[in-house]
Structures are given as structure tokens and as C-alpha cells.
Amino acid sequence: MKKRIKELTDLLNRYRYDYYTKDAPSVSDSDYDKLYRELVTLEQSYPEYVLQDSPTQQVGGTILKGFEKYRHQYPLFSLQDAFSREELDAFDKRVKAEFPNATYLAELKIDGLSISLSYENGFLQVGATRGDGNIGENITENIKKIKDIPHQLSEPLTITVRGEAYMSRQSFKAINEARQENGETEFANPRNAAAGTLRQLDTSVVAKRQLATFLYQEASPTARNQQNEVLAELADLGFSVNPYYQLTSSMDEIWDFIKTIEAKRDQLAYDIDGVVIKVNSLAMQEELGFTVKAPRWAIAYKFPAEEKEAEILSVDWTVGRTGVVTPTANLTPVQLAGTTVSRATLHNVDYIAEKDIRIGDTVIVYKAGDIIPAVLNVVMSKRNQQEVMLIPKLCPSCGSELVHFEDEVALRCINPLCPSLIQRSLEHFASRDAMNITGLGPAIVEKLFLAGFVHDVADIYQLTKEDFMQLDGIKEKSADKLLAAIEASKSNSAEKLLFGLGIRHIGSKVSRLILEVYGDISALLTAKEEEIARIDGLGSTIAQSLTQYFEQKTAAILVDELKTAGVNMHYSGQKVNSDAALFGLTVVLTGKLNQLNRNEAKDKLEALGAKVTGSVSKKTDLVIAGSDAGSKLEKAKSLGIRIEDEDWLRKF
């Protein structure tokens, strides 16, 4: 189970990066949700194996360069997803167990890009993207080009509000027609178009593309008592507020609202992908609190994926950086969610066998919103002695024999000299989350590799201007930019380098956790497996993978070559202080604090080494209780958990 949890964590984190950071989803919503729910189930059954970088413990995406980073004063959370009436009823039961008289506000889930707007004395100061929930991108100048966002409010308030920026279907169609005429790549969907627009460095482009917004939340403290009052105030202040919502205490009425909206979603001028249900009382919201990732007082019902039939014409097999061989089906073109689809993932050999997918089959292809399609199943009634799919025995890149480990669902090439494996590893090293070498994408990497200029990541730092100039299509100016990007990458903090090495099970967050303890890449050459396994959030699988990598002679040589080239080996963040007063304690805040707001208290606790969570359990070490503390305080007392007040916290 531990191994499966790790596999799911790594896979889902890769999909999250593609979705949130690159705005280029690589898996369907349905497939992602299926894997995510499997991970949630396993983590609930085996909580001791939950990893620090699990997507169940995270929000949103990572940060692209090009805009200044912006730390949100009030974090942005994701929402818990629901896909059935039963899950909504379970949510209702949990809420009503604490607040029998709770009412809900159901709002449309706009398929756009989350934004945060901060005003001082009524004037817009900062517009930012969500990013990872704590740090986003400052896109203020682009935000000012969206016509329905007021630069000055109708009242001189200091306030932070949240909402969604989107592109209407009409604007999306016009933009894609213009891009087609100009020979440019068309946007896949309105969400991608909106995301790409907000990241434009040329603000005039933003103005031309006619984005719009719907605001739905006051993140800063508000005098309003109910969510529907918040929407009314936002409208009074001059913001656009979506007119479709329903206030009720009945889940039957909410379900009727969902079905009504689902039936008319194609008639709307913009894309939606579900309905969000929130506890209407803000006081109840505060008492219900948050999990690590999501509020306990809200849930997002997501509409089912759209499905179409297509015929499988052939299958391509490609090798990834870890050697995993992935099948992709070539299809008869079909229109799906507003785009023409001619390729779909088949996931892995076990999936093909389970579904009995064959060449020539008519299959169901599905795609939710802006997600790359996948094959759901075969239409058996249309099968007519189709060709059984031949599973490759040899690597399509190097010809080596493929292996299928018992505990894995994928075929894998284990030849370290496989050209595709090397190229994918180089691409990963240069990617944004790793060393962020701008311009060094797949096409350039392939040319460098085929020319014999690079065979491992250390070779990147030996490249010269003359090397680049020998490649087709590379001019002097491009060569200079590439060399500058390579040089700039040398000063990255070491966790980006560790992640860039592509060690199995070592993601970006795990890299940071490791280096918070060890401080330097060189120290990992002699790190002991049992020491690494003791780091909170890691465990034996990660520890074994890391030590196996650094025990190789080639790893020591590579580290030495990178160090000689001037690549930074040192972690620039704050190392873990095991002497902090509350180091290692799990703490819960409950009730109303008089001197500190919630975020200030949370920051103080984390600075003291504590981990702050939203619910009381047997794992909780300490509860900080303010006035009017409710069920969390009672539960803490029943479990015999240590309880302190705000004055105790302020003494530190």
C-alpha cells in the first residue's frame, strides 16, 4: 500500500503541475478524479503513509517566472469535489451534525482562472493569481485591463476579494479565428485562453481579448454575516456577481438547482464545470474551519464528462524520463468539448488489457472542459473481429527489452543509455519546476542530443555559443539567450537541482523537505537511509530511492561536475529548527481570537515549529481556544488534549 500511495502521489503531482502551472492539462478530469479518490481512500486507511507532498495536502499550482511573486495575506484554498448526490448528502450530514439549522448557498462554478484583488481606501492596489494558494503572481497591470474590474470602489474600503476571470465563448471563438488566419496555434478552450491572456507581458493584448470576471468572496474580515449578503455587497461595490445562485437548507432543492443549471449550461455565454455549495453563515464557516487543503464548509459538485464515439486507427508508444512506456491512440477525428480530438491516452498496458482495447475498435472518448481526452471503454456491440493490440516487447526508442514489474501497471525501459530516456531527463532538468532554463525545450534538447553535444545534465553547463550556432534554426541572438538562461540557472536554490536530477519518488516538495534538513546536495552523498526515512513526510520508499541514487559512483561524478561548473549546491531557504518551542507539535485553532487574527496566529505557531491543522483528532497535541469555542474544544477535552488560550500564545 505504501508503494501505491507513493505512485499515486507522484502521478497526481505531475498532472497538477501540467494543469495549474502550464495551463496545459495532460489527463482528463475523470481520470484525475478517479486516481485522486483512490489516493484519498488509501490515505484514510493507512494515514501513517501520507506523504508531505501528497496532492490531498496541497492547493493549486506552482509559480512561473515573468511576473513578480506575491504572498497572499489570506490564503486561497481548493474545494472538496463531489460527483454524486450521495456525496452531497454526506456533506450535508457532516454540516448538520454540528449545525442542524444550517442553510446553503449554491453558486455556479466558473471555469476560469482564480484571482485575488486587494484594495486600500477603495483603490485597487494588487491583482494576483492563486498560484499555490500562499504565493501567486502579481498581475495587477493586466487585471486593470479587464473592463468589469473597478479601479475604485463605490466606498473607500480596505478589502481583499476573490473571484474568477474567464473568457466568454464569443470572445474565444473570435480570438481563435484570428489566430487561425495568422497561422498561430489555436487555444484549446476558453480557460486556457484566459490563463494565457492574464500571463501576457504586453497589457494591450489583455485589453483586446475582453476578459470578464465574477467575484464571489470577501477574503478579508467583513461585517456581513451571510454569504448571500457578501454577494450583495460585492455587487454594490461595483463588482460583477453571477446572477445564478440559490439559498436553501434542503439538499433536494440544491440537487434540483444543479440539474436545472446542468440542462442550461450550453445556453450560458461562458463555461462552467459544476456548482459550489457553501454554508451560508460566515460564523458557521469559521467554526467548521479547514482541512489542510479545503474548507469544511463548502463542496464543489462537478458535472460528468462529455463523451463521444471514435475509432482507434493505430497506437503510438513513447518513452518517458523514468523509462515508462505510454500508449496513445490515434483516432478518427471527433468534436469534443469544443475542440477536434484525434488522439487519446490509453494510460498503460494493464488498462489496455482490462478494457480489452483493440485496433479498429469503436471506443468511448471523454473530455471534461479543457482536459486532454482519454479512452473510457470499448463499444463491444460494434466490434467485428478487430485486430488484437500488439503490446511491444522492445523499447520503441532503443530496442532494449521492456520489463513489466509485478507491482507496476506500466511497461518500462531500464536501459540507462536509451535515447528517449536521456532526452526526457534533460527536458525535465531544464523545466520550470526544476532548473528553469528558459528556451531549452524539447526541440532544442533533441537537436543537442542528436548532435552529440549533451549526454547528461552536466553537459548542459559545458555548452558553448559555437555549439548552439551549429544547430538548425539557432541564430546568434537565440544562442546568447540560451547561454544566459543556463548561466542564470546556476544560482538556483539546491532543491530545484535535486528535483531536476529526476530521482524516482523525489518531487519538488520532497526535495525541499530533504534539503531543509541536509542543507547541501553534497551532504546527500553520505546520507543514511534510516536518517532520511525519519524526516517528517518522507518514509522508507523515498529514503531508499534517494540513497540508492547517491550510492552510485556516477552520482558522485555528476555532483562533482555540476559543482565544478559553478552550479549552486546549497539550500537557500530556512533550515528546520528542531529547537523551536513548538517543534513537531500538531496544533488546532478554535473560537474567536481577540488580539490576533487567524492568519497571524497561524503564522506565529508555524514560526514556533508547529503544524497547524483544521480539525481535532488523536494526533492533535495542542488546542488554542478563543472565546465562543465550540465542538472542537469539547472534542479536545474528551480526548484529554492540552488546551491553551490566546494569552498563552502571545507570550512567545
Curated annotation (Swiss-Prot):
Gene3D superfamilies: 5' to 3' exonuclease, C-terminal subdomain, 6.20.10.30, BRCT domain, DNA ligase/mRNA capping enzyme, Helix hairpin bin, Nucleic acid-binding proteins. CDD domains: BRCT_DNA_ligase_like, LIGANc. PROSITE patterns: BRCT, DNA_LIGASE_N1, DNA_LIGASE_N2. Its cofactor is Mg(2+); Mn(2+). InterPro entries: BRCT_dom, BRCT_dom_sf, DisA/LigA_HHH, DNA_ligase, DNA_ligase_AS, DNA_ligase_CS, DNAligase_adenylation, DNAligase_N. It catalyses: NAD(+) + (deoxyribonucleotide)n-3'-hydroxyl + 5'-phospho-(deoxyribonucleotide)m = (deoxyribonucleotide)n+m + AMP + beta-nicotinamide D-nucleotide. GO terms for cellular component: cytosol. NAD(+) binds at residues 29-33, 78-79, 107, 130, 164, 278, 302. Signal peptide: none annotated. Its EC number is 6.5.1.2. Coiled coil: none annotated. NCBIfam families: dnlj, PRK07956.1. Belongs to the NAD-dependent DNA ligase family. LigA subfamily. This is DNA ligase. The gene is ligA.
